[in-house]
């Protein structure tokens, strides 16, 4: 376990990745300025509002959308807690939010990347795959995050959770490009990470003199919201897309009429991300002081009012994770998170502590980062869980109690369903045959050979005799798991002839005499099967 920890050999180990400055909507990663746009682009995006028709052609498709897992692989229940290795609460809170991001978790659990990756050491996707797999498949346990997750970022003191979050997302995006070093910006935006978290801003400037229009498209992985004048996330989004007037000293130099003229600038979301990361700007860039105010955020958020195209229906997102900072400054305090497991239950993930929570408690936090997923995506993953598609962390035994044998054959070939079916059928046949044989034997007897008085006369005084139901007719009152337990017990319990072996009884009486003074009133239970 020490090899996987953040803290090794008395010092922090990190040197794999360079620190990333958090992304902002106005960061011009790629610009496309034109008055006329191409008819069609092969960039794969959601067809929800034909969001990619106006973007530049793509030289290479790095992660086709059809390769994303279509069914859920995540266990329905909550996973493991994370050990704090010393000022790493910001790491743990961020990792938990990523772990419970359905599209990312499903891809990681499919192990598709690690099967084709040729540089496992230093690859953030491989590192995150190992972490997410361990976290989701170890419910009730506490695990240590790998040292490679914070390599190049952690300096032994508390850092900003949002910066670490985007550092990790960006490192995963770069890991998608090992064999595609020389690709254009638009091809890079077809990676797996961009398909999950990414979209495009459209900054449109309209000249009020000649009515010429210039569009600039910038990719995003998160959305930063100014909350100083906002009481809710919706108000912050409205302020973000509010048209801005450009005049006077800020007048626009139009490329159409070739003169400085007043103009209006509007920022809208041109493409909708599968998963939205909304960052509430709570910390001052200068002093680091925190804006400790309550900002309301909904469980369901309609993003359609903030999109470039307004002629379509609602675009509903549902909340699935919240990252919270408790404290008065970005330099101190504590980070924790709330996540929604695939079963629908909310949990508070506070380092090693994992406790059930409610949506009321989740919505009352002073949130720092909000995670939303498209409602259609969440429902699709939830439906697959209800059909029993997720692998169980506790192994095949636990799975076979929750899924039918047909489901195991269809959805879990790794569980070797045919052998499991044969074993269960054989076991059921043995149990049925034994009961039937005992019933026939009992019918042919005029008087039972075995009765309570004979047993009590030969057993030591400190043995309490418990008789099991002869034909298990009382089993119908038990729960299914109790019935299964009793069946297993009856199959492994020796017959009464073996239990009444003379040597065994002599040994019991000898042990009873030796311990008589020590355990005068104790009783030992002996299960007798008839």
UniProtKB/Swiss-Prot annotation:
Keyword Cytoplasm attributed: no
Positions of the USP domain: 80-375
Pfam families given in the database record: HABP4_PAI-RBP1, UCH
Biased composition (Polar residues): 496-505
EC number(s) per entry: 3.4.19.12
Low complexity: compositionally biased ranges: 484-495
Molecular function (Gene Ontology), one example: cysteine-type deubiquitinase activity
Disordered: region residues: 382-412, 476-530
Compartments (UniProt record): Nucleus; Endoplasmic reticulum
Keywords assigned by UniProt, alphabetized: Endoplasmic reticulum, Hydrolase, Nucleus, Protease, Thiol protease, Ubl conjugation pathway
Family designation: Belongs to the peptidase C19 family. USP17 subfamily.
Protein name: Ubiquitin carboxyl-terminal hydrolase 17-like protein 22
Lineage, top ranks: Eukaryota, Metazoa, Chordata, Craniata, Vertebrata
